[in-house]
C-alpha cells in the first residue's frame, strides 16, 4: 500500500481516468489520487457496491464506474433532486440527507452492504460524525470508509476549529485509542471498532479506515535460522 501512495499521479490508472475525462465535470484535489489508488485498487473488476455521499456534478460517479469496472454498482446520494439525472448503467442516485439514518437504511436495504463509502457530502462536522457512526458498522467487513475534504474540520462555518470538541478530527484521535484498546491494560475496553478495524490512515484533508478482522497478536523472535512465535500476554 505504501508504494502506491508514493507513486506519482501520472503512473496511476485512476489519475488517467480523471485527466482524460470527457464526460460530466469532476472536481477533486490532485493529491487525493494516490490515496484513492492505494485503498481502492483491490476492488477493481470485482462485484462491489460503492456508496458516494455527495454527487457534485455527476462526473465522479462516472469516474468510479470506469475505474472499478463492469461489476461495480455506484450509488450516489445527495439532497439535490436534480442529481437524479446523473443515473445511467451501473450508477444509481437516491435523493436524501446523509444525516437521515432512515434514508441511509433504505439505501442499504435496496443496494446491499457498501464495500466502499466515500463521504464527500456536506462536510459539516455534525453530519460527518453522525454518518460515520451509522454507516461504518454497516460497511462490508473487509471494506473501506473514506472521508475527504477534512480541512473543514478546522473551519468555523462547518462546525470545525483547531482541537474543537466534536470535530471528526477529534473523534479520530479517540478512535486511535480504540484501535489500540487491547494494549491499554484494561484502561479502555475493546469495542466493536477495535475488533473490526485493521488500520487508520491520515492524509492531507483525508481519513481512511480499512476494515477487517485482526489476527491474534503474535510475537516473532528470530535468531539465526530459528523463529519462535508466542502469544503475547496482555
State what each model feature region is:
Residues 1-118, 122-147, 151-234:
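A short alpha-helical cap/connector motif
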Amino acid at each position: 500500500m505504501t508504494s502506491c501512495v508514493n507513486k506519482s499521479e501520472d503512473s496511476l490508472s485512476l489519475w488517467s481516468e480523471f485527466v482524460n475525462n470527457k464526460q460530466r465535470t469532476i472536481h477533486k484535489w490532485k493529491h487525493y489520487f494516490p490515496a484513492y489508488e492505494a485503498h481502492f485498487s483491490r476492488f477493481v473488476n470485482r462485484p462491489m457496491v460503492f456508496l458516494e455521499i455527495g454527487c457534485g456534478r455527476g462526473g465522479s460517479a462516472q469516474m468510479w464506474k470506469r475505474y472499478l469496472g463492469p461489476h461495480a454498482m455506484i450509488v450516489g446520494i445527495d439532497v439535490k433532486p436534480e442529481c437524479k439525472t446523473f443515473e445511467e448503467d451501473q450508477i444509481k442516485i437516491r435523493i436524501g440527507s446523509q444525516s437521515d439514518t432512515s434514508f441511509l437504511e433504505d439505501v442499504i436495504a435496496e443496494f446491499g452492504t457498501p464495500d466502499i463509502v466515500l463521504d464527500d457530502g456536506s462536510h459539516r462536522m455534525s453530519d460527518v460524525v453522525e454518518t460515520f457512526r451509522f454507516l461504518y458498522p454497516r460497511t462490508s467487513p473487509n471494506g473501506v470508509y473514506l472521508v475527504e475534504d477534512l480541512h473543514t474540520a478546522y473551519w468555523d462555518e462547518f462546525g470545525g476549529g483547531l482541537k474543537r470538541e466534536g470535530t471528526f478530527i477529534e473523534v479520530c484521535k479517540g478512535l486511535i485509542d480504540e484501535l489500540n484498546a487491547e494494549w491499554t491494560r484494561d484502561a479502555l475496553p475493546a469495542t466493536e471498532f477495535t475488533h473490526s478495524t485493521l488500520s487508520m490512515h491520515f492524509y492531507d484533508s483525508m481519513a481512511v479506515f480499512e476494515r477487517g478482522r485482526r489476527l491474534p497478536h503474535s510475537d516473532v523472535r528470530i535468531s539465526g535460522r530459528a523463529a519462535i512465535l508466542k502469544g503475547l500476554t496482555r
